[in-house]
Structure formats: C-alpha cells, structure tokens
Amino acid sequence: MNKCIPMIINGMIQDFDNYAYKEVKLNNDNRVKLSVITESSVSKTLNIKDRINLNLNQIVNFLYTVGQRWKSEEYNRRRTYIRELKTYLGYSDEMARLEANWIAMLLCSKSALYDIVNYDLGSIHVLDEWLPRGDCYVKAQPKGVSVHLLAGNVPLSGVTSILRAILTKNECIIKTSSSDPFTANALVSSFIDVNADHPITKSMSVMYWPHDEDMTLSQRIMNHADVVIAWGGDEAIKWAVKYSPPHVDILKFGPKKSLSIIEAPKDIEAAAMGVAHDICFYDQQACFSTQDVYYIGDNLPLFLNELEKQLDRYAKILPKGSNSFDEKAAFTLTEKESLFAGYEVRKGDKQAWLIVVSPTNSFGNQPLSRSVYVHQVSDIKEIIPFVNKNRTQTVSIYPWEASLKYRDKLARSGVERIVESGMNNIFRVGGAHDSLSPLQYLVRFVSHERPFNYTTKDVAVEIEQTRYLEEDKFLVFVP
C-alpha cells in the first residue's frame, strides 16, 4: 500500500509534487511517499510573516478546542491517524488508540498547559505583560522561529515539542521523521480543521528532508532558526549540532536509558504491575522505558512469577506492535545467548516478552520489544555504577518510600528523573525534562530597568554616578 504525504507550509496543505518526493518503506512492506523540500517550498516557508500575537488565554483556548476534536472517537482526523499508526507503523489497535487519547489529553488539559508556563517561566503572565521583578520589569519574548527535528520512536515527544513552542508564541518549522511521518502532520492538520486562518495554524510548517543527501536547502532552513529542538539518537543530535547556526540554542533530547529498582516489596502484585507497565509502554522505544530491573531483597522467584503474569496481562490489554524479521531474529538471538550463558530465561507466547535473570556485571544484547534483564542485588551500592550522567534518564522505584531513601545518591550519580514504578510515561507538571526547563530556552527574557532615582534596598539615595565620581564618594554607598 502506498500513501502520499504532502507538506504543510504556513498552515496550508500543499499539493503533492510527483517530482519531489522520497519513498520510504515502513511496516509490512507498506510504503509512503514523503514530499521533500524544494527551492520553491523553502522560499515559501522562510517568507513567513505571521506572528502569534495572542495572549496565553487565547492560545490555551485554541489548543483546547482542537483537543475536543481529538477527544471524539468519531473525529475523522483521529480515525485516520489511528489507521495510519496500525497500517504503516505496526501499532496494535490498542496502542494506536492510546496514542490518539494522549494527544487529546495533552491538548485538553488547560490547567496543565498554564502550569507548564508558570513553573518553567515563573509566571503565566510574563509572556503577555511586563512584570515587576527586583529593580526591573521583565517580559518573555518568543525566540522566533523554532525548528523541530523530530524522532519517530515516540510520537508524543513531537506533540510535546510543538506545544511548548506554541505556548511560548514561537513559529514552528517541523521536520518529521521518516519512521513517523504522520503525527506532526495529523496534529497541524487538526489545527487547520478548527480554524485555517488562526495565527497558530498559519505559524505551522511540516516538512521532510533526508539527512544523507544534499544539504543546501535544509541548511537554508536551519540558518533561519532562532532555536532548534532536536530529538533522536546520537547521529540525529550530531546532525543538529553540525547544521545549526552557532548563535542559537539547541535543545538536545538525545538517547537515554532507564531502569527500575524494586526493594523488598510487600505487595508483589503491585510491584510487578508497575514494572510491566514501564517495560511495555512504547515497547521500550522511549528513553523512559525500563530495560533493566534491580531487585533488592529476597523472594525474587515470587516476583518473577508475578512479573510473568503482569506481562501476559499487558499482552492482552496493550498488545505489542508488529516486529520485522530482523527484530524477531534479534529477540531469538538474545534468548539463545542468555540460555548459552547459563542465565534463567522466561518468555511469553509468540515473543510477547522476554525476561533474563543475570548478574549485574553481565549485559547481553538488548532487542527491546518488551525484553528485560533482572538483576538481584543486596544493596543500592551495587546499582549506583549503572546510573550514569547524561545517559540515565528515569529510575522508577517500588515501593515509593524507597525513593525517598535513595534519591540523593541517585541524583549525585546523574539520574534525571525518579518516579514510582508504573509512572515512567507520566511527566509530572513542574518537573525537569532531561535536566532542563525547556520553555526557558524558547524565550528571551527582556529586562526594563528602573531609572536612577529609584532607590534600592541597599542604596537609599538616587544613583547619581557622575556626582559620585566627581566627589569620589563611591565607597560611602557600599553597604
């Protein structure tokens, strides 16, 4: 099955150019034809004149209106998106519907949208008006043009990236991934459905270019960026750094790994349920997905038995996506290598999941796709060497009380997020993302400083600098 995906420029869906596209093979030999940038499309994109001259309330209300469309299971755009995820990306029906549900949740959570701005920027008003702060007035201005280099493994990361830029009133040039050319296109198309003439809609462009071909046109787009948001693996991040202008900030959301810690659980079922969720969500394609479980205490066999049950449960309520021949082969190879090494191996029907019980210092291949290594340890000290700065994103812990004991040690070792088991995909409002408060990198804080006759806490006289120099009285005013 072939599908043509046009680009969107300044909120307008472009006619598909039969002379400028790249054909990409996706799941089960299904193919898509992706429009690629041309001299004409780049010129149109860079001639954008519209700015998001709206207050935060208007922005949030527009996003909420779009979200209400996504909330309806009868919305045609939502139904098409679910079908595309299943047909072309190999998602199970449950996984695809959950993805659409999460898009609705992100757009409709008005309180969370306000709180994201409040906690990252310090106030929900700083984008709209000058606020008194110390001896100044301060206002946050959008950087301008935000270029989003999206990854294909976690569709919601692209949605999050775009929403952050919209909340901070930045225009968006969105470069989709060939492994998920659908999500950004569907989101921006839903903006068009609601109001094609809305300033937010008209500030959106969605396009594609290959990384391994002539960079002349893509370099023009990158040169136009005021801020770059890069998602993906090492090569994607290196590309972003290489082709971004030297003066712009690059928000790098690169490859990370995550793990779970289970300490002497009284409720074995709850512990195993949380770990199973953290393994199964996105089939371990996300940075926050658990790949290793460290079990502190006794009764490991009981935990493993329950983890089997919970993984079987998730195989029913959230079936994994389809795997290619190579992915299935990697899964089988990991199983055989682990058995040859003498490790305990448990597996689900039809490669639904894989558990390998191994020592902490022995790591085999990681085929992902719901495969996990379980290591029994006696103390947190045995786990700390595997928590690495800039590489370990999320540590999920059960019971929650154990996280209070270990969070300082984990933080010093470099972890970026600590959550309760079963919560790795929920990024709580107010938290950091990969050690950053991302919205701060999407704005310029402008300060309007008070005049000379404004007295400060430490200097209760007018700041007459010329007079102080003439009379050599500077030290008189030093507190």
UniProtKB/Swiss-Prot annotation:
It catalyses: a long-chain fatty aldehyde + NADP(+) + CoA = a long-chain fatty acyl-CoA + NADPH + H(+). Pathway: Lipid metabolism; fatty acid reduction for biolumincescence. Pfam families: LuxC (PF05893). It is an enzyme of class 1 (oxidoreductase). GO terms for biological process: bioluminescence. Keywords: Luminescence, NADP, Oxidoreductase. GO terms for molecular function: acyl-CoA dehydrogenase activity; long-chain-fatty-acyl-CoA reductase activity. Its EC number is 1.2.1.50. LuxC is the fatty acid reductase enzyme responsible for synthesis of the aldehyde substrate for the luminescent reaction catalyzed by luciferase. Belongs to the LuxC family. This is Long-chain acyl-protein thioester reductase.
